[in-house]
Amino acid sequence: MEINPINYIAGINLKSLKKSTEPEPQKSVDKSENLIKELDKMSMINNVNIGKKDYELNLSMEELEKRTHKDYLTTKKMLAVDAPEYLELEEGDKEALKHLVKAAVVLDKVNMQLDNPNNLPFKEYLEAEISKGNEQAKLTKILFDAQKGVCSLDRESNMIELIKGVSERPGKGVYPQDLEKDEFHAILIKMLKDGKVDDVAKILNQRSVVERVGNELVATDYVDKFKDDFAYMASELEKAAETSTNADFNEFLILQAKALRTADPMLDAYADKKWATLQDTPLEFTITRENYSDELTETVVENPELKALLDENGIIPVAKDFLGGRVGIINKKGTDAILGVKNYLPLMAHNMPFKDDYIQNISPDKESKQTMVDADLVAVTGDVGEFRACITLAENLPNDDKLSIKELDGGRRNVYHRQIRLITSEDAREKMKKRLAATVNPELHQYYNDEADHWFTVGHENGHSLGPKSGTEGLGKYKSIIEVNKADMISLAMLDVLTEAGMYTPEQRKQIIVTYAADNMMTSKPTLSQAHRVRSVMQNYYFIKEGAMEISPEGILNVDIEKMVPTARKMLEEIIQVQMKGDFSKGEKYVLDNFVWTPEMETMAQNIKKVSKTLNGKVESPLADKLLES
């Protein structure tokens, strides 16, 4: 039986948000509609939807049947109920795993509210309609559960809106739905001129939900906003710590539980610092905090008057965190293989461009504060479990904006997701072969190796710990695009250094280069909100311009292997210069100059789509579902 995580959680009551499906009374239509409109305006203050009594489903049955078909909706399966990784755990860790899953699923409910205020009430509406036999609602629910929300881009960069008339907002669910950029800036300017500096600082930090109060905006810390949910999570983490067999892991769980109970960023910092030291633990638990989704906060650097006031008052704007939960079992063999790179991190730091002009998380002459594990996944929830065109392959956390890095001199930790990266079915391998045949010069096929993609990812994640540690906030909405671009180019630019040092063989070097190039080809031009996909277009354009790659008029990729690393080095140098300057206009120019979709890229995209129909994906978590029953 599949357990719905949101409905499972004890104490959750969504009845007050539920949309009635009873027919509207026919009397006084005009008056009631006017009242609804006024209530809608008022509801914008706290992101509560009053609106119409019924939602209108946006996708037709034909479109839903297509998008939920297995050819279009791929599946990533987390650990099975009888997985040996689970069965081999000690009993105390098995018991702890139950509580970790119960804690993690709370973040589905929390993050849906951060994402869009319609998410939870629409979920309730769908469930009510499904109980009446509504097939359109049933198929819509499959997509809703996959993308964990009402709005999502697919792999072809089409915005999929499940509710008619409901679109994604730049401020997602962390800002009032009617707040536009110009008004946002004007309110902040007035508040700063009125001396409300602390209030503005809270609005522009990464851990608050912003609401209207009169003509101003007020921020509420996540811990206070979701007090009951976080208290439930804390209780489950404390229960897990009672039976888990690893003392270090238990210490982290207790620290994280404290941080969930009190709105104090330093409590999170202590938990983060401990988490980043975890290396030899049986279990994995993370509250992921990433800020790729918020498109409103960092627009403040685009307004000269507002930017000057922020600088004058020492306020650094940081995009809002969106929250996810990761529960897993550490794979020792995979972890040992990944750990081999740790010895080379100082060498990589030493070979960074302009290394003497900034501070890095990894020091060229000291032991690195970087741990890394390979995890067999039991559950991915909230932000890290969303399948929106793609799904998270690995993470290097905490990010540089977190206090454990800035105030406590803590380290970082890489977690790699085995169930998401591994190609296990023959069907998937056959699709991969067809894609290669349709898009890559046959002479290069010998070098394509899906395991090489994992090693490129290892380089990418460690790349986040290299380069300027701070000072990039002024890049605004381009900061994330430039950062993920930097991480990619570090992975590629360091190949010759690492091959010479013995980490890779010459054959592995070629495999990483060709596999990177083949996998970097896109099915469509993305939107600027898709940082990870924008960087791919930028790189493809840059490498083609430099003669390291070529796409024929027929859409076939050719790679000049020996030009790839020097080209990556050149691009990395340019990226580091942009990051060091931290200037919005320079960052914007760099992105837009290279974010060019050529006719050859479009031909390539059409070739890919002929052999791969996939538009999105979903996650299945059989072991997690079973643990939620117990």
Model-derived segments and spans:
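N-terminal helix-rich structural modules
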Residues: 56-256, 271
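Low-complexity, intrinsically disordered export/secretion signals at extreme N-termini
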Residues: 1-62
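Post-HEXXH active-site segment of zinc metalloproteases
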Residues: 468-485
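Active-site recognition of the HExxH zinc-binding catalytic motif
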Residues: 90, 455-469, 487, 492
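Contiguous, non-catalytic segments that form substrate-binding/exosite surfaces or channel walls
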Residues: 224-441, 449
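Extended, compositionally biased alpha-helical segments that mediate assembly or anchoring
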Residues: 577-630
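An active-site-proximal "capping" alpha-helix that borders the catalytic cofactor pocket
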Residues: 246, 480-497
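Long, well-structured alpha-helical subdomains associated
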Residues: 492-594
